[in-house]
């Protein structure tokens, strides 16, 4: 037990010793003139209730990878290489190491823009983002993005502009209980897209085979002097391919349901077994959920290697 502990202590000591040596290497020797190594990137917010972790994915450039939360071993390994790229040792060190994260001001600007857009999409319509660059020793720089979200806007009213009368009548009957957007809730662009998907799901489950969410759009207008937004949902008519005329969306009903085999035409299972695993039923409106369930059911049958459901 004592020998094992001594061995573990030696390994750990060697690792930290190597880390110290590598950390002492000049990591700025490959930097072009007037360039800076991106040392650290930080997010701050004037609103302390803001979840900063939700905005970290918008950071386009970060510093080099750290090991043990302290040492940039991959960067230091890269820095051990000489400038003669023809030598194998230099090539090897560069391949296993990590290139210096040279500050790219274009990416910094893009990050600031993306962060501001993300805040506005989350309902902070007056949001701005500032950047602060702090140059530290040895040509290194720390970048801080300061989020200034401002007040959160809320929905004042939701209006529906449905240009297809048949869909308007059907939605009035089947959709009101499923409506998500309501007066008083925080404005959020993500929720608008979720509403498009919900309406699309309702319609494709009720016969509208060709309907997709691109038929739905939104307009949002802020109320002057208030932190409120009026929302209008627009649902357009159907436009056939290669046509300039709009028509009503067609609702389809399932006719007959038939089964065919593969190349030899032979069914892998009895028709009764296939019918038991088929959610699509004759005489019912087309339903995208039933289509997915049928694919899932057939996928669990070992005798069936491939399923292709076609509508004609």
Q: Where is each model-derived feature located?
A:
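Interaction-mediating elements
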Residues: 2, 26-301, 306
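Gly/Pro-rich turn-and-neighbor structural signature
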Residues: 310-311
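Bacterial N-terminal signal peptides that target proteins for export
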Residues: 2-11
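Gram-negative bacterial Sec-dependent N-terminal signal peptides
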Residues: 10-19
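C-terminal motif of bacterial Sec signal peptides marking the signal peptidase cleavage site
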Residues: 20-24
